[in-house]
A protein has these predicted regions:
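Short, charge-rich amphipathic segments
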Residues: 2-7, 36-43
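Redox-cofactor binding/interface segments in oxidoreductases and associated redox assembly factors
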Residues: 19, 42-43, 84
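Class I S-adenosyl-L-methionine
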Residues: 27-38, 47-178
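SAM cofactor-binding core of SAM-dependent methyltransferases
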Residues: 1-23
Length: 178
């Protein structure tokens, strides 16, 4: 709910579906909602059950299986490409079996996708935080394209450095009202 409220406040669009992901397809089918054609689908499924910080439950947890709703969306709507994101710990959850299953399902969704999987260390890309994330880029096989992982720039940056030189008139630089 908080994410939807933030999105509505910052992105002025009526195309916001603010329901539990588990209800998405039943509501789309029931209300005969037709989604506009889209080329890209970006999603991050809950990391709670895959994180090394948590209990590492993977598919045995409440949130682990939620990735499958993204797979179903890809199956139904066949975007040209997709990007999925999760924590680095996903690769070892359930002794690595969960990650293999997720990759298998994403690869075979729709008419099939070529996957590029990479663990990004964002501090190596000039982001002032040590967040390590697995990013999966899938491109329709029929397009005969492959995503190329960008090389790190290794320019480490502090939060102060990142925030201190933003021009006052920069796009989206207005102060928020919370």
């Amino acid at each position: 709910q908080d994410s939807c409220s933030t999105y509505k406040r910052n992105i002025k669009t009526k195309a916001i579906f603010c329901e539990k992901v588990e209800n998405f397809f039943s509501l789309v089918d029931k209300k005969k909602i037709i989604l506009p054609k889209f080329d890209c689908f970006a999603y991050g499924f809950p990391c709670n059950d895959f994180s090394n910080v948590g209990e590492h439950l993977g598919f045995r947890g409440k949130f682990g299986p939620l990735y499958s709703y993204g797979v179903e969306l890809i199956d139904r709507y066949h975007p040209k490409w997709f990007i999925a994101e999760n924590v680095g710990g996903i690769s070892s959850s359930n002794e690595g079996k969960a990650f293999k299953k997720i990759l298998f399902d994403l690869k075979h969704a729709g008419k099939g996708y070529n996957l590029t999987v990479h663990k990004y260390k964002f501090e190596e890309y000039g982001i002032p935080q040590a967040r390590h994330r697995i990013i999966i880029v899938g491109i329709k096989k029929e397009l005969n394209l492959k995503f190329k992982v960008p090389k790190p720039n290794y320019k480490m940056m502090t939060a102060k450095e990142a925030l201190s030189n933003i021009p006052f008139d920069a796009y989206d630089n207005e102060l928020t009202k919370n």
